[in-house]
């Protein structure tokens, strides 16, 4: 079964996308799992933060284009779409700037000895998201998990 994107303002077909086969889904899961087990996910956080900074810069550089796409596909006012795009760049930049602090080990006083909390990647995350805010719904899951080293696979809610 194919998926179609239709402009809700005029019912014009924008594009048809093929459905993913079971093999496609399995391949995506395997790639995400390989990334989770890689040095990229488990190693130093700096490369992941650099990706988030680059993502924020790319969103900013193409903000108007992204806003127009969201408005055309979702039937949203362009002002709302611009706000959503701007928010997504801010979210990516926020985690790029702060995740190192958020994920740093935290020591706690204890009468029984040393105690601390460490943060480590937990694995591949599957995000089933509504698409009424197509960029924001993904970014709010992607940015913190990318910083933490957790690959994310997203699927729209059906």
Where are these regions (language model features)?
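Conserved small-residue-rich beta-alpha loop and adjacent elements
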Residues: 105-158
């Amino acid at each position: 079964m194919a998926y179609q994107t239709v402009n809700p303002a005029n019912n014009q077909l924008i594009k048809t996308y093929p459905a993913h086969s079971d093999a496609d889904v399995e391949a995506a899961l395997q790639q995400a799992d390989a990334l989770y087990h890689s040095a990229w996910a488990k190693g130093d956080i700096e490369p992941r933060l650099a990706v988030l900074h680059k993502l924020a810069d790319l969103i900013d550089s193409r903000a108007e284009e992204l806003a127009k796409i969201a408005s055309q596909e979702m039937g949203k006012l362009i002002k709302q779409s611009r706000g959503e795009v701007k928010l997504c760049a801010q979210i990516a930049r926020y985690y790029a700037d702060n995740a190192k602090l958020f994920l740093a080990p935290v020591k706690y006083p204890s009468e029984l000895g040393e105690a601390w909390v460490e943060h480590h990647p937990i694995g591949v995350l599957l995000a089933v998201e509504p698409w009424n805010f197509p960029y924001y719904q993904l970014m709010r899951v992607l940015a913190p998990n990318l910083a933490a080293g957790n690959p994310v696979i997203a699927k729209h809610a059906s």
